[in-house]
Regions:
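Short glycine-rich or small-residue beta-strand-to-loop segments that form or flank ligand, phosphate
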Residues: 77-79, 109-120, 156-160
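Gly/Ser/Thr-rich loops at beta-strand to alpha-helix junctions
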Residues: 115-123, 163, 190-194
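A structural signal for small-residue-enriched, beta-sheet-centric alpha/beta enzyme cores
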Residues: 157-158, 187-290
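Glycine-rich phosphate/diphosphate-binding loop of Rossmann-like nucleotide-binding domains
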Residues: 117-152, 156
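An N-terminal, well-structured beta->alpha segment
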Residues: 60-105
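N-terminal amphipathic/basic leader segments beginning at the initiator methionine
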Residues: 4-70
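A structural-propensity feature for long, helix-poor, extended segments
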Residues: 147-176
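Proline-aspartate-enriched helix->loop->beta-strand connector
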Residues: 177, 182-183
Length: 290
């Protein structure tokens, strides 16, 4: 947010701030807090056009203020991700792998859970990842014992959604964890973002687990260490944004870039922005074409 739009946001219409808008990205919560929050450590590095940010929320007070859980959040951003070259793709994949590896226990099997509805493009990320995964749990029994230490047991499932199965995803995963006994669960899901420019350009990795659908106000039983009994690492990419956000971004561009607002009319602009965001568009969410 730039220029007048940033001032308008701070002045009133967007005062709900960190707890008043829905997002699955810890980075956006930090940004709305002014970039500095007591009890939160943030480090940022740049590599090959990719922005690598590591956020650690250490205090419960900070977690409550941001609406996040205490723990580690790794965010990778590449603004032209859908059109990046092969070299950048490899670098980004390596950074994602490194981030996941840094949060995983050193030993033990891993269960990968692809969340979402495979019939809805914006919600099919988790299921599509599982379809392309190399699972190895069943292979460990077929190879020589001396080689097993180099092959970690990985199993995967796409459990569907409550509306199709009638069963909470967390309930299905809890049963699987009891039987498979992994050392950790990796949950992959589509996320919701507050800023439209983050759609399909950002990857978030966290060791705090995930609450499916929370970004769009559809609260389900969470996949966390408390509910499953093992460490849960969540990996996600923002795939949806609120329609009101797109309207605000468009208005901000017109105001900031083309000077379509005369001085002295800021209060009227705030009212217009509020009407657009809260009245006409409400909780409608938007996703890119496939």
């Amino acid at each position: 947010m730039r220029g007048f739009f940033a001032r308008a946001f701070q002045a009133g219409w967007g005062k709900k701030s960190m707890r008043g808008f829905r997002t699955d990205l810890a980075m956006e919560c930090i940004d709305e807090g002014g970039g500095r929050v007591e009890g939160v450590r943030v480090s940022t590095h740049h590599m090959g056009g990719i922005t690598h940010t590591r956020i650690r929320i250490e205090k419960e007070r900070a977690a409550e203020l941001l609406g996040r859980h205490t723990g580690e959040y790794i965010t990778l951003e590449y603004r032209d991700l859908p059109r990046c070259d092969a070299h950048t793709q490899k670098l980004l994949a390596a950074l994602v792998a490194q981030g996941v590896r840094s949060l995983l226990p050193r030993e033990g099997e891993v269960l990968v859970v692809g969340l979402g509805n495979r019939n809805v493009t914006a919600d099919a990320l988790g299921t599509r990842v599982v379809e392309r995964m190399l699972v190895t749990r069943h292979l460990r029994q077929a190879i020589a014992r001396e080689l097993r230490g180099r092959l970690r047991g990985v199993s995967a499932i796409a459990p569907g959604v409550l509306g199709l199965t009638g069963i909470e995803t967390a309930e299905l995963c809890r049963g699987l964890v009891r039987h498979v006994r992994p050392s950790a669960v990796i949950a992959i899901d589509a996320l919701a973002a507050f800023e439209s420019e983050r759609i399909c350009t950002t990857v978030q990795i966290t060791d705090t687990g995930i609450e499916p659908g929370s970004g769009v106000g559809n609260h389900r039983l969470g996949l966390t260490e408390e509910t499953l009994g093992v460490k849960v690492i969540a990996v996600g990419v923002p795939m949806v944004v609120y329609a009101s956000t797109i309207a605000r971004d468009a208005m901000a561009h017109l105001i900031d870039e083309y000077g379509l607002l005369a001085r002295g009319h800021e209060e009227a602009a705030q009212q217009l922005l509020r009407q657009v965001s809260e009245g006409f568009l409400g909780d409608m969410v938007v996703t890119p074409r496939e």
